[in-house]
Curated annotation (Swiss-Prot):
Major location category of this protein: cytoplasm
Subcellular localization, as worded in the UniProt entry: Cytoplasm
High-level lineage: Bacteria, Pseudomonadati, Pseudomonadota, Betaproteobacteria, Neisseriales
Top-rank taxon, per record: Bacteria
Gene Ontology BP, a term: protein quality control for misfolded or incompletely synthesized proteins
Known catalytic reactions: Hydrolysis of proteins to small peptides in the presence of ATP and magnesium. alpha-casein is the usual test substrate. In the absence of ATP, only oligopeptides shorter than five residues are hydrolyzed (such as succinyl-Leu-Tyr-|-NHMec, and Leu-Tyr-Leu-|-Tyr-Trp, in which cleavage of the -Tyr-|-Leu- and -Tyr-|-Trp bonds also occurs)
Record-level GO cellular component terms: cytoplasm; endopeptidase Clp complex
Source species: Laribacter hongkongensis (strain HLHK9)
Assembly information from the UniProt record: Fourteen ClpP subunits assemble into 2 heptameric rings which stack back to back to give a disk-like structure with a central cavity, resembling the structure of eukaryotic proteasomes.
Keyword annotations of the record: Cytoplasm, Hydrolase, Protease, Serine protease
Protein name according to UniProt: ATP-dependent Clp protease proteolytic subunit
Length: 212
Protein backbone atom coordinates (compact mmCIF):
# COMPACT_ATOMS: atom_id res chain seq x y z
CA UNK A 1 0.00 0.00 0.00
CA UNK A 2 1.32 3.45 -0.88
CA UNK A 3 2.43 5.53 2.08
CA UNK A 4 0.03 8.33 2.94
CA UNK A 5 2.83 10.89 2.56
CA UNK A 6 3.41 9.89 -1.08
CA UNK A 7 -0.11 9.83 -2.49
CA UNK A 8 -0.92 12.44 -5.12
CA UNK A 9 -4.71 12.44 -5.38
CA UNK A 10 -5.94 16.03 -5.45
CA UNK A 11 -9.06 16.68 -3.40
CA UNK A 12 -11.62 18.83 -5.27
CA UNK A 13 -11.87 22.10 -3.37
CA UNK A 14 -15.26 23.05 -1.90
CA UNK A 15 -17.24 25.12 -4.38
CA UNK A 16 -17.92 28.85 -4.08
CA UNK A 17 -14.82 29.51 -1.98
CA UNK A 18 -13.08 31.63 -4.60
CA UNK A 19 -9.31 31.48 -4.86
CA UNK A 20 -7.94 28.36 -3.17
CA UNK A 21 -4.54 28.83 -1.47
CA UNK A 22 -1.68 26.56 -2.47
CA UNK A 23 0.83 25.02 -0.07
CA UNK A 24 4.36 24.16 -1.17
CA UNK A 25 6.20 21.39 0.66
CA UNK A 26 9.84 20.39 0.46
CA UNK A 27 10.79 16.74 0.17
CA UNK A 28 13.79 14.69 -0.83
CA UNK A 29 12.43 14.73 -4.37
CA UNK A 30 12.04 18.50 -4.53
CA UNK A 31 9.05 20.76 -4.08
CA UNK A 32 5.43 19.68 -4.33
CA UNK A 33 2.43 22.02 -4.41
CA UNK A 34 -0.99 21.14 -3.02
CA UNK A 35 -4.20 23.10 -2.80
CA UNK A 36 -4.94 23.64 0.88
CA UNK A 37 -7.80 21.11 1.00
CA UNK A 38 -5.71 18.33 -0.51
CA UNK A 39 -2.98 19.12 2.01
CA UNK A 40 -5.46 18.88 4.88
CA UNK A 41 -6.79 15.61 3.47
CA UNK A 42 -3.31 14.21 4.08
CA UNK A 43 -4.01 14.93 7.76
CA UNK A 44 -7.29 12.96 7.39
CA UNK A 45 -9.45 16.09 7.46
CA UNK A 46 -12.50 16.02 5.16
CA UNK A 47 -14.54 19.16 4.55
CA UNK A 48 -18.30 19.12 4.01
CA UNK A 49 -19.01 22.72 3.03
CA UNK A 50 -22.21 24.13 1.57
CA UNK A 51 -25.44 22.35 0.65
CA UNK A 52 -25.55 18.55 0.91
CA UNK A 53 -26.00 17.42 -2.69
CA UNK A 54 -25.32 14.17 -4.53
CA UNK A 55 -22.06 15.69 -5.80
CA UNK A 56 -20.96 16.77 -2.31
CA UNK A 57 -21.88 13.37 -0.89
CA UNK A 58 -19.95 11.52 -3.60
CA UNK A 59 -16.82 13.55 -2.83
CA UNK A 60 -17.11 13.05 0.93
CA UNK A 61 -17.78 9.32 0.55
CA UNK A 62 -14.86 8.89 -1.86
CA UNK A 63 -12.48 10.67 0.50
CA UNK A 64 -13.56 8.59 3.50
CA UNK A 65 -13.13 5.36 1.52
CA UNK A 66 -9.70 6.51 0.35
CA UNK A 67 -8.58 7.38 3.88
CA UNK A 68 -9.82 4.00 5.11
CA UNK A 69 -7.67 2.28 2.47
CA UNK A 70 -4.64 4.32 3.60
CA UNK A 71 -5.04 3.54 7.30
CA UNK A 72 -8.14 1.70 8.58
CA UNK A 73 -7.15 2.22 12.23
CA UNK A 74 -6.76 6.00 12.30
CA UNK A 75 -9.63 8.45 12.85
CA UNK A 76 -11.13 10.56 10.07
CA UNK A 77 -12.11 14.14 10.92
CA UNK A 78 -15.23 15.49 9.18
CA UNK A 79 -15.47 19.30 9.35
CA UNK A 80 -19.05 20.49 8.75
CA UNK A 81 -20.18 23.95 7.65
CA UNK A 82 -23.47 23.24 5.92
CA UNK A 83 -27.07 24.51 5.73
CA UNK A 84 -28.26 20.97 4.97
CA UNK A 85 -29.72 19.60 1.78
CA UNK A 86 -30.72 16.29 0.23
CA UNK A 87 -31.81 13.60 2.67
CA UNK A 88 -30.74 10.71 0.44
CA UNK A 89 -27.34 12.31 -0.23
CA UNK A 90 -26.85 12.87 3.49
CA UNK A 91 -27.82 9.30 4.28
CA UNK A 92 -25.19 8.03 1.84
CA UNK A 93 -22.56 9.88 3.91
CA UNK A 94 -24.13 8.59 7.13
CA UNK A 95 -24.09 4.97 5.95
CA UNK A 96 -20.48 5.28 4.83
CA UNK A 97 -19.47 6.72 8.22
CA UNK A 98 -20.87 3.57 9.81
CA UNK A 99 -19.63 1.22 7.08
CA UNK A 100 -15.94 2.09 7.19
CA UNK A 101 -13.60 0.87 9.91
CA UNK A 102 -12.07 4.20 11.07
CA UNK A 103 -13.99 6.23 13.62
CA UNK A 104 -15.31 9.47 12.14
CA UNK A 105 -14.99 12.53 14.35
CA UNK A 106 -17.30 15.44 13.50
CA UNK A 107 -16.69 19.15 14.08
CA UNK A 108 -19.14 21.99 13.39
CA UNK A 109 -17.47 25.14 12.11
CA UNK A 110 -19.95 27.91 11.33
CA UNK A 111 -23.21 26.04 11.03
CA UNK A 112 -24.64 22.55 10.90
CA UNK A 113 -28.30 22.77 9.93
CA UNK A 114 -30.83 20.14 8.91
CA UNK A 115 -28.88 17.24 7.34
CA UNK A 116 -25.68 18.94 8.50
CA UNK A 117 -26.88 18.67 12.10
CA UNK A 118 -27.88 15.04 11.57
CA UNK A 119 -24.39 14.16 10.33
CA UNK A 120 -22.80 16.16 13.16
CA UNK A 121 -24.71 14.04 15.68
CA UNK A 122 -23.68 10.85 13.88
CA UNK A 123 -19.98 11.17 14.65
CA UNK A 124 -18.24 8.65 16.87
CA UNK A 125 -19.33 8.88 20.50
CA UNK A 126 -17.07 11.18 22.46
CA UNK A 127 -15.73 12.68 19.21
CA UNK A 128 -18.51 15.09 18.20
CA UNK A 129 -17.45 18.70 18.57
CA UNK A 130 -18.48 22.28 17.80
CA UNK A 131 -16.61 25.56 17.96
CA UNK A 132 -18.00 28.11 20.45
CA UNK A 133 -19.81 30.41 18.01
CA UNK A 134 -21.16 27.76 15.65
CA UNK A 135 -24.89 27.27 15.18
CA UNK A 136 -26.90 24.07 14.93
CA UNK A 137 -30.45 23.72 13.60
CA UNK A 138 -32.70 20.67 13.52
CA UNK A 139 -36.09 20.33 11.84
CA UNK A 140 -38.26 17.87 9.96
CA UNK A 141 -37.57 17.01 6.29
CA UNK A 142 -38.79 19.46 3.67
CA UNK A 143 -40.08 18.50 0.26
CA UNK A 144 -42.20 19.54 -2.68
CA UNK A 145 -43.92 17.60 -5.43
CA UNK A 146 -46.06 18.14 -8.50
CA UNK A 147 -48.19 15.46 -10.08
CA UNK A 148 -51.38 13.47 -9.78
CA UNK A 149 -53.31 13.25 -6.53
CA UNK A 150 -52.46 9.57 -6.13
CA UNK A 151 -48.75 10.39 -6.53
CA UNK A 152 -49.05 13.03 -3.82
CA UNK A 153 -50.19 10.31 -1.43
CA UNK A 154 -47.22 8.12 -2.34
CA UNK A 155 -44.72 10.93 -1.81
CA UNK A 156 -46.40 12.04 1.41
CA UNK A 157 -45.99 8.52 2.82
CA UNK A 158 -42.35 8.50 1.77
CA UNK A 159 -41.49 11.82 3.43
CA UNK A 160 -43.27 10.74 6.62
CA UNK A 161 -41.28 7.49 6.58
CA UNK A 162 -38.05 9.46 6.19
CA UNK A 163 -39.08 11.85 8.95
CA UNK A 164 -39.60 9.01 11.41
CA UNK A 165 -36.39 7.26 10.36
CA UNK A 166 -34.29 10.41 10.82
CA UNK A 167 -35.90 11.12 14.19
CA UNK A 168 -35.23 7.56 15.35
CA UNK A 169 -31.57 7.73 14.33
CA UNK A 170 -31.01 11.16 15.84
CA UNK A 171 -32.78 10.16 19.06
CA UNK A 172 -30.34 7.25 19.38
CA UNK A 173 -27.33 9.51 18.75
CA UNK A 174 -28.55 12.13 21.22
CA UNK A 175 -29.62 9.63 23.88
CA UNK A 176 -33.13 11.07 23.94
CA UNK A 177 -36.63 9.59 23.67
CA UNK A 178 -38.12 9.59 20.17
CA UNK A 179 -40.91 11.83 21.45
CA UNK A 180 -38.36 14.59 22.16
CA UNK A 181 -37.13 14.58 18.58
CA UNK A 182 -40.64 14.48 17.14
CA UNK A 183 -41.53 17.54 19.20
CA UNK A 184 -38.28 19.45 18.77
CA UNK A 185 -38.01 18.97 15.00
CA UNK A 186 -41.59 20.01 14.27
CA UNK A 187 -40.32 23.51 13.41
CA UNK A 188 -36.88 25.02 12.81
CA UNK A 189 -35.05 24.63 16.13
CA UNK A 190 -31.87 26.72 16.42
CA UNK A 191 -29.21 26.08 19.05
CA UNK A 192 -25.87 27.56 19.98
CA UNK A 193 -22.94 25.26 20.71
CA UNK A 194 -23.70 25.03 24.43
CA UNK A 195 -27.35 24.16 23.75
CA UNK A 196 -26.31 21.53 21.19
CA UNK A 197 -24.08 20.00 23.86
CA UNK A 198 -26.93 19.95 26.36
CA UNK A 199 -29.26 18.39 23.79
CA UNK A 200 -26.79 15.60 23.03
CA UNK A 201 -25.98 16.54 19.44
CA UNK A 202 -22.30 16.99 20.34
CA UNK A 203 -19.97 15.83 23.10
CA UNK A 204 -17.83 18.91 23.64
CA UNK A 205 -17.52 22.59 22.77
CA UNK A 206 -13.93 23.26 21.73
CA UNK A 207 -12.59 26.61 22.89
CA UNK A 208 -9.13 25.87 21.50
CA UNK A 209 -7.05 23.00 20.14
CA UNK A 210 -5.69 22.19 23.60
CA UNK A 211 -9.23 21.17 24.61
CA UNK A 212 -9.24 18.23 22.18
Amino acid sequence: MQNVRDWQWSQPAPQALGLVPMVVEQSGRGERAYDIYSRLLKERIVFMVGPVTDETANLVVAQMLFLESENPDKDIHLYINSPGGSVTAGLSIYDTMNFIKPSVSTLCIGQAASMGAFLLSAGAKGKRFALPNSRVMIHQPLGGFQGQASDFEIHAREILTLKRKLNELMAAHCGRPLEDLERDTDRDNFMNAAQALEYGLIDQVLENRAAV
